[in-house]
């Protein structure tokens, strides 16, 4: 009983500390972007199509592949959400191809 009360008290203190000192994590991408969006792939999508037609070439194919740890940038699955780095400082369009 005392152990349970102690654990509950410690968790309560930790929750209060977390509210007072929230941790903000800013994602970092190889292309220098510090922001991202989620894009759910549709049938017929490719990383090239996503980069060029949907994001108007403001991100490279290989930037998307790296952000999602894709071993094969030519293979993406419809219905799968992918992280798209936004506002890249540099664009990698071919090192992974």
From Swiss-Prot:
Protein name: Secreted LysM effector Mg1LysM
CDD domains per UniProt: LysM
Record-level GO BP terms: effector-mediated suppression of host pattern-triggered immunity
Keywords: Cell wall, Disulfide bond, Secreted, Signal, Virulence
Main subcellular location of this protein, as a coarse class: secreted
The species this protein was found in: Zymoseptoria tritici (strain CBS 115943 / IPO323) (Speckled leaf blotch fungus)
Keyword Disulfide bond: yes
Domain LysM, chain residue ranges per copy: 37-84
Keyword flag Signal: yes
Paired cysteines (S-S): 31-88, 62-96
Single GO term (MF): chitin binding
Residue ranges crossing the lipid bilayer per the database entry: none
A Pfam family this chain is assigned to: LysM
Subcellular location: Secreted; Secreted, Cell wall
A cellular-component GO term for this protein: host apoplast
Signal peptide region: 1-18
Family to which the UniProt record says this protein belongs: Belongs to the secreted LysM effector family.
InterPro entries: LysM_dom, LysM_dom_sf
Positions annotated to bind chitin: 44, 48, 74, 76
Domain of life: Eukaryota
Other noteworthy facts: In plants, chitin acts as a microbe-associated molecular pattern (MAMP) that is recognized by lysin motif (LysM)-containing plant cell surface-localized pattern recognition receptors (PRRs) that activate a plethora of downstream immune responses.
Quaternary structure and interacting proteins, as annotated: Forms homodimers in a chitin-independent manner through interactions at the N-termini of Mg1LysM monomers. Homodimers are further polymerized in a chitin-dependent manner.
Purpose of the protein: Secreted effector that enables the plant pathogenic fungus to manipulate host defenses for successful infection. Binds chitin but not cellulose or xylan. Chitin-induced polymerization of homodimers forms a contiguous Mg1LysM highly oligomeric super-complexe that is anchored to the chitin in the fungal cell wall to prevent hydrolysis by host chitinases.
Effect of gene knockout: Impairs protection against host chitinases and developes significantly more pycnidia.
């Amino acid at each position: 009983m005392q152990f349970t009360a102690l654990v509950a008290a410690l968790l309560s203190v930790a929750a209060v500390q977390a509210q007072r000192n929230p941790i903000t994590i800013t994602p970092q991408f190889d292309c220098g972007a510090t922001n991202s969006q989620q894009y759910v792939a549709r049938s017929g999508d490719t990383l090239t199509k996503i980069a060029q037609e949907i994001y108007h070439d403001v991100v490279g194919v290989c930037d998307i592949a790296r952000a999602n740890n894709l071993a094969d940038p030519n293979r993406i699955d419809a219905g799968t959400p992918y992280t798209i780095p936004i506002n890249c400082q540099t664009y990698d369009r071919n090192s992974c191809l």
